[in-house]
Regions:
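HotDog/MaoC-like acyl-thioester-processing domains
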Residues: 1-9, 88-90, 95-217, 299-347
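Generic detection of short hydrophobic beta-strand segments and adjacent strand-loop junctions
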Residues: 22, 142-144, 225-228, 291, ...
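Hot-dog-fold acyl-thioester-processing enzymes
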Residues: 1-90, 154-288
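Small/polar glycine-rich anion-binding or flexible loop at a beta-alpha turn
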Residues: 289-296
């Protein structure tokens, strides 16, 4: 249970810059594209990427979650304590420039807001990624619910510790003294974060295969189905660096109160993003992607889980040749995205 003397709202605004940069690797882009089943040629060959005007292999939309997870480790392991776990609820990607192989990302992390809903703490973390040119290329907002001992049994943590890979920390064990020291240091040495947003995605001529003139409000995207096996979940866990065993271990999933192993929320979002960019024909034409998770996708051991994606045009802006999409994702007939939207630019 959260320590009554420890007020997480006092940490709002806590921020730091990760000491080292994250370099987007050519083969890592391909690994991640395979993990989210994204076959767009720009993720796989330099020739296809160059034909769209990119300098290297283009990373899939949700690829940025990998450096974000690395960057947020300090926040959740050494700064925010008292929770037994976290449940992801919302994710927003602001895409100012597509990531390409060779990019060096400098990460700024901030605890943006803390809200209480139905007695639970909802924490929103902001990740700002600056490239080697000093421009902000991606901003990501992640909202999680802090889970206490009332939500997660104590034996769950012990069971997880027995099955996760050596050297992986799932929950924090920092003391309040360490928190105070870390908090003070971060405020005293706050980095000069980049303020210039890259205008690449807003000024570049999109190379979409669909044109603005061919669309109307209410237009429905061709539906897409995705198939997930336990092997897909294990692969995504390794590629993304998400060690949570509820995504691959039956016993831990059941002990955590789940009916079975479930797919990573970020994996389902990655599949959804690929659904959008495959239809567009240009990964860089997606400028904002927002998802609220409302349910989980179960993946049984004996059979694959099937996900269904559909979408429609919510609005069109003829002056900017942009559109807003509403995306629906279902698993076993249940909606797993409560609300999902995408801002796109069109040729």
């Amino acid at each position: 249970m959260v320590d009554a003397t420890y007020d997480v709202t006092a940490l709002v605004g806590h921020h730091y810059r990760v000491d080292d940069y994250y370099e987007v690797g050519r083969e890592k882009v391909r690994e991640y594209a395979r993990a989210v089943q994204d076959d767009h040629p720009a993720h796989w060959t330099e020739k296809a990427a160059a034909e769209l005007g990119y300098s290297g292999l283009v990373a899939p939309t949700t690829f940025v979650s990998i450096p974000a997870m690395i960057a947020n480790r300090r926040l959740f392991e050494s700064v925010i304590t008292g929770y037994n776990g976290y449940l992801q609820t919302d994710q927003v990607f602001e895409l100012y420039k597509p990531l390409v192989a060779g990019d060096r990302l400098f990460s700024d992390v901030e605890l943006e807001t803390v809200r209480q809903v139905a007695g639970k703490d909802l924490l929103t973390v902001k990740n700002t990624f600056t490239d080697q040119a000093g421009e902000v290329v991606h901003v990501m907002h992640t909202t999680v619910v802090g889970l206490t001992s009332e939500d997660v049994a104590e034996e769950v943590g012990d069971a997880m510790a027995r099955v996760v890979m050596h050297g992986v920390e799932l929950l924090s064990s920092a003391t309040n003294q360490e928190i105070a020291a870390s908090n003070g240091k971060a405020k005293d040495s706050a980095p000069e974060a980049a303020t210039a947003l890259s205008d690449f995605s807003r000024t570049r001529q999109p190379q979409t295969t669909v044109r603005f003139e061919d669309l109307a409000v209410g237009f429905e995207l061709p539906a897409r189905e995705a198939r997930l096996t336990r092997g897909d979940l294990v692969n995504y866990a390794g590629v993304s660096g998400d060690p949570n065993p509820i995504h691959w271990h039956d016993g831990i999933a059941v002990l955590s109160g789940l009916p079975d192993v479930i797919a990573h929320g970020m994996l389902t979002m990655g599949l959804g993003a690929g659904f959008i960019t495959d239809w567009l024909g240009d990964p860089g034409a997606l400028t904002r992607y927002s998802v609220r998770l409302s349910n989980y996708a179960i993946v049984e051991a004996k059979s694959a889980g099937n996900l269904e994606f559909s979408g429609r045009i919510k609005s069109l802006d003829p002056e900017t040749r942009t559109a807003v999409l509403v995306i629906t994702a279902k698993s076993a007939g249940r909606k797993i995205f409560g609300l999902a939207t995408a801002d796109i630019r069109l040729a």
